[in-house]
Regions:
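Hot-dog-fold acyl-thioester-processing enzymes
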Residues: 1-55, 109-132
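Intrinsically disordered, low-complexity segments enriched in small/polar residues
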Residues: 24-27, 58, 83, 87
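Hydrophobic residues positioned within well-ordered beta-strands of beta-sheet architectures
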Residues: 6, 54-56, 71-73, 87, ...
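HotDog/MaoC-like acyl-thioester-processing domains
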Residues: 1-3, 65-67, 78-132
Length: 132
C-alpha cells in the first residue's frame, strides 16, 4: 500500500463567515487522516510514544464549501529519516477536485530531544512510502 485513503465529514461549525471551511480546520482534518493512516498500517503503539510536529504546510487550491458528502484525503509517506518522517496529504472535495495539498514532518521525541524512529514504526511507515 503506497497511498492511504480516508474520508472526513465537514461540520457546519467548520465554516468561516464566507461559507468556506476555515483554514485552521484543515489542520484538524490532516491530524485525523494522519492518525487513521498510522492505525491502518497496524502501528498500534501510535499513541504510546512521543512525536512532535516540526513542520506543517498547506497549499490551498480551491475553497471547500459545506456539504454533507465527505472529503477524501490521500496520505503518503514521502521520506523516512533517522528521527523523523515526512507525510504528504491531498484533500479532494466531493466532486473529486483537488482542494488542498499539505505536508508535515513528524519527529520522534523523548526527554526534550529527537530520538531514532522505533523499528516497528519504521517498518510500518515504509509500507506506505511513496517512491518517486
Amino acid at each position: 500500500m503506497s497511498v492511504f485513503v480516508t474520508q472526513v465529514y465537514r461540520r457546519f461549525s467548520d465554516l468561516d463567515p464566507l461559507g468556506h471551511v476555515n483554514n485552521v480546520v484543515y489542520l484538524d482534518y490532516l491530524q485525523e487522516a494522519r492518525l487513521r493512516a498510522l492505525m491502518q498500517i497496524d502501528y498500534a503503539d501510535t499513541l504510546k510514544f512521543s512525536q512532535v510536529m516540526a513542520h506543517q504546510s498547506i497549499e490551498f487550491r480551491r475553497p471547500i464549501l459545506y456539504s454533507t458528502d465527505p472529503l477524501t484525503i490521500k496520505v503518503t509517506i514521502s521520506s523516512v529519516g533517522k528521527t523523523s518522517y515526512r507525510m504528504k496529504y491531498r484533500i479532494f472535495n466531493e466532486l473529486g477536485e483537488l482542494a488542498a495539498e499539505a505536508e508535515s514532518v513528524m519527529v520522534c521525541f523523548d526527554n526534550d530531544k529527537a530520538v531514532p524512529i522505533p523499528d516497528k514504526l519504521r517498518s510500518a511507515l515504509q509500507s506506505i512510502l511513496e517512491v518517486e
